[in-house]
Swiss-Prot record:
The Vlp and Vsp proteins are antigenically distinct proteins, only one vlp or vsp gene is transcriptionally active at any one time. Switching between these genes is a mechanism of host immune response evasion. A lipid is attached at C27 (N-palmitoyl cysteine). Pfam families: Lipoprotein_2. Its main location: membrane. This is Variable large protein 21. It is found in: Cell outer membrane. The keyword Lipoprotein applies. One of its GO terms (cellular component) is cell outer membrane. Genes for both Vlp and Vsp families are on (usually) unnamed linear plasmids in B.hermsii HS1. Belongs to the variable large protein (Vlp) family. Alpha subfamily. A lipid is attached at C27 (S-diacylglycerol cysteine). The gene is vlp21. The lineage of its organism: Bacteria, Pseudomonadati, Spirochaetota, Spirochaetia, Spirochaetales. Keywords: Cell outer membrane, Lipoprotein, Membrane, Palmitate, Plasmid, Signal.
Length: 364
């Protein structure tokens, strides 16, 4: 009986040892975390941007995914009631820094392609040409983002005080913001991104509610009245961030001035951002909603800007309008940046693949 039990135990021990050996072999065949291998495969877009660009088998879409991974900790910034204008500046600087990193990755691709090539022949390298063209666009965008990073101050986004008049933005900083936004849009258009259309909706929509008094939160000569912040919020619901951005960049730098007469359908976001007399600002029911909304966004983001508010904690309502306008504009700018980078990487990837694709013997 004891011999039989001993034999059974020995067989169990042998079986357990064999299972352990099999498990150890299996574990040894697994790729390490974060690495690719025959046993693991590679996820779409994995690898650094430079690696994806240099691998002929990877698509342009993979390159864009690698870029999105690079900027994933920066994209999607949203201003809140506690967000300072300079915090938004930090977001712009961070996004610009990521474009700088992408540019460095591109440079690495060019350097790798030039290994073993005489300097005199390097200028004829199609990969270097493709990289230089892409870097030029990315560096231009970075410059404009860096500029946007300096136009704010330590006050909250959409800054407002209870039962108080608003304050005009610093005109020099407003011009800087305008130039940067226009530069981003022009660069994007040069890279094949469609320019957004300016919204034509007026502050009075058809025969419906007239929200022209919403412009009074941009008054610099007196507090807003009851309901003005609500009408400003209603104006924002009628326009998109893209329409606001288009309205801003379709302005001209010389429009960064105080409004001294009644507004018209031609009054620009830059003028609304500087503001003026409340009666002048709210005089025309045909003022463009995108212009008023763009002005609110700029007032909320640029140094010195402050929104007017009524009493009874109306400053919270005015600030809420400013934050909404600012976030709409930020989303539009970020979207334009992403589309531009996507187009740039697609073009660069195509040229790089063409240069590295093996040619038939007769075409060597």
């Amino acid at each position: 009986m004891r011999k039989r039990i001993s034999a059974i135990i020995n067989k169990l021990n042998i079986s357990i040892m064999m299972m352990i050996v099999v498990l150890m072999i299996g574990c040894g065949q697994q790729p390490e975390a974060g690495k690719t291998g025959a046993a693991g495969g590679e996820k779409q877009g994995a690898g650094s941007l430079s690696e994806v660009l240099m691998e002929v088998g990877k698509s342009a879409e993979n390159a864009f995914y690698s870029f999105l991974e690079l900027v994933s900790d920066t994209l999607g910034f949203t201003a809140k009631s506690t967000t300072k204008k300079e915090d938004v500046g930090g977001y712009f600087n961070s996004l610009g820094g990521k474009l700088g990193e992408a540019s460095n990755e591109l440079e690495q691709v060019a350097k790798n392609s030039e290994a073993g090539i005489e300097k005199n022949d390097a200028s004829k390298n199609p990969i270097r040409s493709a990289v230089n063209a892409a870097k030029k666009t990315l560096e231009a965008l970075k410059g404009y983002l860096d500029s946007l990073g300096t136009v704010g101050d330590s006050n909250p986004v959409g800054w407002a005080s209870n039962n108080a008049q608003g304050a005009a933005v610093d005109e020099a900083e407003l011009k800087k913001a305008y130039k940067a936004l226009k530069g981003i849009m022009d660069t994007a258009e040069g890279a094949g991104v469609a320019r957004p259309e300016v919204g034509n909706i007026a502050v009075k929509v058809g025969n419906g509610t007239d929200n022209k008094d919403g412009a009074k939160i941009l008054a610099t000569d007196g507090a807003a009245a009851v309901g003005d912040a609500g009408k400003a919020a209603a104006i924002l619901t009628t326009v998109s961030g893209k329409e606001m951005l288009a309205s801003i960049v379709n302005s001209t730098e010389d429009k960064a001035v105080k409004i001294t007469g009644n507004v018209t359908v031609e009054t620009t976001p830059l003028e609304f951002a500087v503001g003026g007399n409340g009666a002048h600002l709210s005089q025309n029911a045909n003022s463009k909603a995108a212009a008023v909304a763009g002005g609110i966004a700029l007032r909320s983001l640029v140094k010195g800007g402050k929104l007017a508010a009524d009493n009874n904690d109306d400053d919270k309502a005015s600030q809420g309008v400013g934050i909404t306008a600012a976030n709409k504009l930020l989303v539009a700018v970020e979207d334009i940046i992403k589309k531009t980078v996507k187009n740039v990487l697609e073009k660069a990837k195509g040229e790089i693949d063409k240069a590295r694709d093996p040619k038939p013997a007769g075409q060597q």
